[in-house]
Amino acid sequence: INNNSFYRELVGSKNSTAWNDLPILNKKNLQKPLTERLSKEYSPKSVFVNKTSGSSGDPFVFAKDKYAHAITWASIIHRFGWYKINFNTSFQARFYGIPLDFIGNKKERIKDLLSNRYRFTIFDLSDVVLEKVLVKFRTKKFDYINGYTSSIVLFAKFLQSKNIVLKDICPTLKVCMVTSEMLFEDDKILLEKQFGIPIVNEYGASELDLIAFQNTNGDWQVNAETLFVEILDENNHVLPYGKEGRFVITSLYNKAHPF
């Protein structure tokens, strides 16, 4: 609060040091210029700047200081490592969107090249396009699949129609991580059958970090290393274990743009 005028304004004249007295933010609170939300001693040029996808209906630009950004990636690398995925050497089949403008598209392709991944764009997943995707799996030694749940499920249904198990034609595959959208149990069973590899579910938010990740025992493991996760009722009171409520998440390390 002492270092960020945006939060000082939200708190107002309250002088309490109690955690529960702090206001809970929503994305509408953040619909103002980034420069008005950054902490003292930070500028857009000294931080990592990105924007959310808008899947919740309220897209916005956010920032992370370099230390927080590095810790986010350390958290991701650690969890993928549970499944013997090494970001330096493992080759990723990536089912994600990509900017359509020329410069944005080329930047993303260069990032893919440097990050050891091959991107399948998800804007057109017709049978003709999926046939081309299948050819890539026949000819490239992918180690793992990562991307949007719905796109990966659609590819699995295509394989089912062809009576093909992906592991049979791409034996280097080890695991598939799905993200961004809910994975239903029926779809997970389909993916396991048509891919022939373990299916791992993750839940995250780009402005925060991985929030929860399925561990090797098949259980959801909440990220308590970089986030403080609370389950609250409609009056913002902490609920007892096992009760349903709202996820309220605090990033523990982002000093430039606290959440």
Regions found by a protein language model. Give the residues of each.
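Short, well-ordered beta-strand segments
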Residues: 93-95, 248
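Active-site glycine/GP-rich loop and adjacent strand/helix microenvironment
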Residues: 112-259
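Conserved coil-to-alpha-helix start sites within the AMP-binding
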Residues: 98-109, 127-128
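Short acidic/polar alpha-helix capping motifs at helix-coil junctions
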Residues: 44, 96-101, 149-155
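Rossmann-like NAD(H)/NADP(H) cofactor-binding core
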Residues: 91-93, 201
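Nucleotide 5′-phosphate-binding alpha/beta core
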Residues: 1-51, 56-91, 98, 134-146, ...
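Alpha-helical membrane-targeting segments
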Residues: 88, 106-115
